């Protein structure tokens, strides 16, 4: 499911969800909400903060040290620079929903 399909799914799910505070959600509002969540997670991760959404999962940043590697084409040794790797760990509720 791509982003556009997910936004359509959000609006449909809102209309059928008995727990939703509002029974109407336009695609424009759903897109704004989704973009806000994505932008907020990215901003928090860039600021070196972990984002824990209980039951859903956590977004974290892991620092990877510089290391020596090989160019797969030539086999020549090269140094792979240190970098920060964003990671996602699924929460219990999400794991249970998948099984």
UniProtKB/Swiss-Prot annotation:
This is DNA-binding protein HU. SUPFAM superfamilies: IHF-like DNA-binding proteins. Belongs to the bacterial histone-like protein family. Signal peptide: none annotated. Keywords: DNA condensation, DNA-binding. The gene is hup. GO terms for biological process: chromosome condensation. The lineage of its organism: Bacteria, Pseudomonadati, Pseudomonadota, Alphaproteobacteria, Rickettsiales. PANTHER family: DNA-BINDING PROTEIN HU, DNA-BINDING PROTEIN HU-BETA. PROSITE patterns: HISTONE_LIKE. It comes from the Bacteria. Histone-like DNA-binding protein which is capable of wrapping DNA to stabilize it, and thus to prevent its denaturation under extreme environmental conditions. GO terms for molecular function: DNA binding; structural constituent of chromatin. SMART domains: BHL.
């Amino acid at each position: 499911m791509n982003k556009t399909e997910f936004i359509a799914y959000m609006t449909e799910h809102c209309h059928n969800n008995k727990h939703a505070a509002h029974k109407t959600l336009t695609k424009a509002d759903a897109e704004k909400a989704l973009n806000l969540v994505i932008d907020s997670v990215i901003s928090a991760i860039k600021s070196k903060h972990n984002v824990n959404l209980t039951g859903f999962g956590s977004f974290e940043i892991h620092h990877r040290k510089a290391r020596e590697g090989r160019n797969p084409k030539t086999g020549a040794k090269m140094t792979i620079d240190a970098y920060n790797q964003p990671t996602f760990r699924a929460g219990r509720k999400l794991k249970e929903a998948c099984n």
